[in-house]
Regions:
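A short, flexible beta-alpha/helix-coil linker loop
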Residues: 11-12, 68-71, 106-109, 147-149, ...
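Active-site acidic/histidine proton-transfer and metal-coordination neighborhood
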Residues: 17, 76-173, 183, 255-266, ...
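Histidine-acidic metal/acid-base catalytic patches
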Residues: 1-8, 12-28, 55, 95-96, ...
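Catalytic-core regions built around general acid/base machinery
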Residues: 47-58, 126-134, 191-194, 221-226
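Short linear motifs at secondary-structure transitions and domain/linker junctions
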Residues: 35-38, 116-117, 148-150, 176-180, ...
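Short beta-strands and strand-loop turn motifs
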Residues: 5-8, 35-36, 64-65, 100-103, ...
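Structural motif corresponding to the early beta-alpha repeats
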Residues: 21, 33, 37-125, 232, ...
Length: 282
């Protein structure tokens, strides 16, 4: 995945036909190279419809998800494998290039103690099986570290490297997120430098998940680090504008983070594109 993309939460978290049509058309209007589809209910998605939409508008796509509680890999690796296989099949049928996100667990998965070796072993077992299935469908499989308040298993770039190397699948990659890095890493560059060997995708998300350039993220440090490692992967803007209550609860989004999607797309996107150009990433 290369170029600039956007998470479809900008317009919808419900990937039904109306939601897909709105998001794909809007992403194309703003000149995106790809979109990231929140695959929260894979069985309900009309893959042929989505594939046709993407082809019509000339967009590539990646899918992302978090595992539901009954399929958390740390405690139910068998259920996680089953859930991921269904999602991978749907992503492949849509013509997507990868499945990423919190593929190892769920938003809100916390035990109150650090992850145990048994939990990490279970996660690795699930991801190994999922990576094999992904490879059979021509897909990459990513893992996204998130902050300590959303999950206790994977919070930093170096933890993601350790998990990728434990699984040992050649089609696995690391997917970082500046919002989570702003909480967990010792400086914006650290996670990028730690994950450099496997880093193929990054969420560009402001400190409040609103409009990039209007918060506390050190964007110069982020883009300088990406330039330093010769990053050629996907740059995906993520801002949580249209959140259904059940997802907003899990992400602790209690108020609007921006006026509307136009504010983010017309101010945040040019800001990020200019930074990428400044550091010769596009």
């Amino acid at each position: 995945m290369q170029g600039f993309g956007v998470h479809t939460s900008m317009w919808t978290m419900n990937w039904d036909k109306p939601g897909a049509e709105r998001a794909v058309a809007a992403a194309a209007h703003y000149g995106m190279d790809f979109i990231e589809i929140a695959l929260l209910n894979a069985p309900a998605v009309d893959a042929a419809h989505s594939r046709a939409l993407l082809e019509k508008h000339g967009l590539k796509a990646i899918c992302s998800l978090g595992l539901p509680q009954n399929a958390w890999a740390s405690v139910r690796p068998d259920r996680a494998i089953e859930h991921l296989k269904v999602a991978l099949d749907k992503a492949a049928d849509m013509g997507c290039l990868a499945l990423s996100g919190v593929t190892y667990g769920g938003i809100g998965e916390r035990t109150g103690v650090p992850p145990t070796q048994n939990e990490i072993d279970n996660v690795a077992t699930a991801l190994e099986a999922a990576a094999r299935h992904a490879k059979s469908r021509g897909l990459l499989l990513g893992i996204e570290p998130v902050n300590r308040y959303e999950n206790h298993l994977l919070n930093t770039g170096w933890q993601a490297v350790a998990l990728v190397e434990k699984v040992g699948a050649e089609n696995m990659f690391i997917h970082l997120d500046t919002y989570h890095m702003n909480i967990e890493e010792k400086g914006a560059a650290n996670g990028i430098l730690d994950a450099r060997k496997y880093l193929k995708y990054i969420h560009l998300s402001e400190s409040d998940r609103g409009t990039p350039g209007c918060g506390t993220c050190d964007w110069d440090e982020v883009f300088a680090a990406l330039a330093a490692i010769g990053f050629t992967g996907g740059l995906a803007m993520e801002s949580f504008i249209n959140m259904p209550p059940e997802i907003a609860h899990g992400l602790s989004v209690w108020r609007p983070v921006a006026k509307d999607e136009s504010e983010v797309m017309e101010n945040g996107l040019p800001f990020l594109r200019n930074k990428a150009k400044q550091y010769k990433l596009i």
